[in-house]
Amino acid sequence: MKKVWINGCFDVLHHGHFKLIQYATGFGGNLFIGIDSDKRVKQLKGEGRPFHTALQRKYNLECILGVRQVFIFDTEEQLRGILETIKPDVFVIGSDYIDKPIIGAEFAKEIKFFDRIGGFSTTGLLDE
């Protein structure tokens, strides 16, 4: 079975996250997910974030059918180390990363881009 990788904050799961997971699982049977640590989410998203702790986010994702394993990473080096160990067949990432450096891409056999679903973002939901 193919190993498929996605990563992100996944702070408050919404429709866009589920579409990403559905898209990624279409490439193979084993979906591995990396999530940013609480410290990293706060650095990326600002004060008041994350809404859910890393352990809560990990648990929520592990409850989704098709998710094989969820990893929490605190640094880019840790993310690279996880990807080097897993060596995914497919690395799925948002299409906003086309022509941008992708951390750990060198460990994947193939990169697939996912077009984000307009109007769905955790930040947008929390700001409402």
Residue ranges of predicted features:
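Nucleotidyltransferase catalytic core that binds NTPs
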Residues: M1-E128
